[in-house]
């Protein structure tokens, strides 16, 4: 799954992080996204060699209220291989990720709530149908807000994974706000696992700086192989990312985001008919991303 990036339901749950102070709540968020990564040498891919690079473009539409959210994402990944790895069973073509995620919350009182979490995704290589690239996730969580500075959500999701079937995945999102100008989030979902630190540079929260370190995963269904049968690829990465979000006017409608990332670790595991048959890693790589969006 993307984000990616990022697991989309987490973007929806964390939508309030984009709310500028002194601006009425706006339930809709529309984002255009672009990202590029440098091409780097692959290793641990004997007997083949070469380079791998990736770029991404897409859009995201979120509807969010304090007790419910729905997030739709479309991303197109261009995967570029060079050298002898190109055309081997350790390479694949361009991929597409369509995802619908969301949550619904029921409040017990001001401190305790329960949530249902859901995700539908089609993640597939060119030449593979939407239905064959389909998978899903469903689960529940409990939310505890002991004070104004602390917000903890803990649960479990059943996730259909191309490479491993259906697995129970822990879900954790813990946010601590020590002051109006700072926020720390610990996130563990199986798809995104790590720490995010946010700093607000202005009193109206119109300018935000993010620093994050994550272990993130992507999984795509690949075209069948005449030798191995069904195929999938699971990508695990550890990006260190710093970004800036800037609202462009006092109404809090239009904003831009930019980020730089250094990916210390990236590993591609290929599953053929349920068994891991190939792996490669890339040297440390860097990348840029840019987003523009509006709230209304």
What are the roles of these predicted feature ranges?
Residues 21-84, 186-191, 223:
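Short glycine/proline- and aromatic-enriched beta-strand/turn motifs that initiate or cap beta-hairpins
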Residues 24, 62-67, 104-110, 144-148, ...:
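Outer-membrane beta-barrel strand-turn architecture
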Residues 34, 114-124, 150-160, 172-197, ...:
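Transmembrane beta-strand segments that form the barrel wall of outer-membrane beta-barrel proteins
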Residues 34-40, 65-67, 74-80, 120-126, ...:
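Transmembrane beta-strands of outer-membrane beta-barrel pores
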Residues 51-57, 92-98, 130-138, 166-170, ...:
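Residues that define the transmembrane beta-barrel architecture of outer-membrane proteins
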Residues 66-72, 108-116, 148-154, 180-186, ...:
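Repeated loop/turn-to-beta-strand initiation elements of outer-membrane beta-barrel proteins
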Residues 75-88, 189-288:
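Outer-membrane beta-barrel translocator/channel fold
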Residues 171-181, 242-244, 281-296:
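Outer-membrane beta-barrel "beta-signal"
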């Amino acid at each position: 799954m993307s984000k990616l990036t990022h697991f989309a339901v987490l973007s929806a749950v964390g939508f309030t992080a984009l709310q500028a102070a002194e601006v009425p709540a706006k339930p809709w968020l529309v984002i255009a996204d672009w990202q590029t990564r440098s091409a780097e040498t692959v290793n641990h891919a004997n007997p083949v060699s070469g380079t791998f690079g990736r770029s991404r473009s897409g859009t995201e539409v979120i509807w969010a209220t304090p007790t419910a959210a729905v997030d739709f994402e479309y991303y197109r990944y261009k995967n570029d291989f060079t050298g002898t790895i190109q055309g081997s069973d350790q390479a694949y073509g361009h991929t597409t990720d369509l995802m619908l995620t969301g949550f619904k919350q029921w409040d017990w009182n001001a401190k305790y709530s329960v949530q249902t979490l859901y995700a539908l995704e089609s993640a597939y290589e060119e030449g593979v149908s939407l239905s064959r690239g389909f998978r899903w996730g469903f689960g529940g969580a409990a939310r505890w807000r002991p004070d104004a500075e602390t917000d903890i959500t803990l649960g479990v999701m059943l996730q259909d994974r191309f490479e491993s079937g259906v697995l129970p995945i822990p879900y954790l999102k813990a946010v601590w706000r020590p002051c109006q100008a700072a926020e720390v989030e610990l996130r563990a979902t199986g798809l995104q696992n790590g720490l995010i630190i946010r700093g607000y540079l202005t009193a109206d929260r119109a300018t935000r700086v993010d620093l994050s370190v994550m272990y993130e995963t992507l999984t795509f269904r690949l075209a069948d192989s005449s030798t191995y049968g069904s195929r999938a690829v699971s990508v695990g990465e550890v990006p260190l990312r710093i970004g800036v979000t800037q609202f462009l006017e006092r109404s809090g409608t239009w904003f831009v985001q930019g980020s730089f990332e250094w990916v210390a670790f990236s590993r591609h595991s290929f599953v053929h008919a349920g068994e891991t048959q190939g792996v490669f890693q890339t040297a440390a790589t860097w990348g840029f991303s840019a987003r523009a969006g509006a709230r209304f």
